Amino acid sequence: MKKSILLFFITFLVISCSSDRDYLPEDFWGMKLKRKLTGNEAKDFVDKLHFQNVATEKNEVGFYTGEIGNATIYITYYTDEKTAYQDFRKMTEKISPENSMFVRGTYHNINNKQLYSCMGLGQVHYVFAHQNLLFWISVDPHFSRNFLDEYMKLVMN
């Protein structure tokens, strides 16, 4: 009996530690993942958006499309939670001034998570850190909040 419990516990730990969550699923909220960038391709894409080197070594970008509209999810991986949160603060402070292409920037507390939202380029943008990850979600305005709520459930659970 003790061996069975120990074997179950070890198996559970191995599965839990080895499973990587897919933050860019093939289908999400009625939309299809049309393109996924990883590795150097994702890093180069993020750097080109900023006209300078800003991306960490590990990034992912997912482009979603469906009948309802479009969304893009940018994910940056950090070595620890503290660095992810520091970059969240740094990034949101940099885009907060009304002289940037982003307007109406506001901090919120949604689902017990500090989040920043703003408007720009015809979309609503949400930025938040979770564990060692930094997320930037750009989504069409007419379904942005519902999309965010569902995506946060995916990330937090």
Predicted feature locations:
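Short, low-complexity, disordered segments immediately C-terminal to signal peptides
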Residues: 21-31
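Short Gly/Thr-rich strand-loop-strand
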Residues: 29-52, 81-125, 157
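C-terminal motif of bacterial Sec signal peptides marking the signal peptidase cleavage site
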Residues: 15-16
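Short, exposed beta-strand-loop hairpins at the edges of beta-sheets
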Residues: 126-130, 134-144
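Positively charged n-region of N-terminal signal peptides that target proteins for export
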Residues: 1-4
